């Protein structure tokens, strides 16, 4: 939580370490945040640079903000966890949802050091934040071999024309779960 008191902002989520002092188990910031959106983005960028230095994954960071407070941070962990879904945005979404006790990020914003890839964009839409802010573009990422253009193109192709073999199988059996979902009283709609 952050609380702005005159020229002092008190919080447990550091945004700008240079203005940070530790008192009684909380971080105290001295000075005003000039532009919170830029500070949140700088934190995502800092995470991306820290990730490069640590060698834990690609140069990507993300933070999720609610009510002016960073509630979750994520950095790319693909290579350090052997999880191809552990992109910075997905890591941050998982942490934020756990923090909030919700599968939706109502009234949240996500700040990404780079324009989200197709997978992350899908995850972000499912999480339903109110805004996405990004720094680097997908072209910037493509220039260092993180090129997702082929995925965007594949999504647009008819299933039978995709490069990854995709074939429907046992639809009639699978429809049973769809029908169950329609009538169950145990579902939480989303």
Residue ranges, per PLM feature:
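Short beta-strand scaffold segments in enzyme catalytic cores
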Residues: 59-65
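Intrinsically disordered, low-complexity proline-rich regions
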Residues: 4, 9-20, 27-30
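A short acidic/small-residue loop/turn micro-motif
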Residues: 78-80
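Zinc-dependent deaminase
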Residues: 28-53, 116, 123-190
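Helix-adjacent hinge/juxtasegments
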Residues: 82-127
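Short hydrophobic alpha-helix segments
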Residues: 72-74
């Amino acid at each position: 939580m952050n609380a702005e008191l005159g020229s002092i902002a008190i919080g447990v989520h550091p945004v700008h370490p240079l203005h940070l002092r530790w008192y009684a188990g909380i971080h105290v910031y001295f000075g005003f945040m000039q532009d919170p959106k830029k500070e949140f983005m700088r934190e995502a960028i800092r995470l991306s640079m820290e990730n490069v230095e640590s060698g834990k994954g690609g140069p990507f960071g993300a933070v999720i903000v609610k009510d002016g407070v960073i509630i979750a941070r994520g950095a790319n962990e693909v290579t350090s966890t052997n999880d191809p879904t552990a992109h910075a945005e997905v890591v941050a979404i998982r942490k934020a949802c756990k923090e909030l006790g919700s599968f939706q990020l109502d009234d949240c914003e996500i700040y990404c050091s780079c324009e989200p890839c197709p997978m992350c964009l899908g995850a972000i839409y499912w999480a339903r934040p109110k805004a996405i802010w990004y720094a680097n573009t997908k072209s910037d990422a493509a220039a260092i071999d993180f090129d997702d253009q082929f995925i965007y193109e594949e999504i647009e192709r008819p299933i039978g024309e995709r490069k990854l073999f995709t074939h429907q199988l046992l639809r009639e059996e699978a429809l049973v779960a769809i029908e169950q979902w329609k009538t169950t009283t145990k579902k939480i709609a989303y």
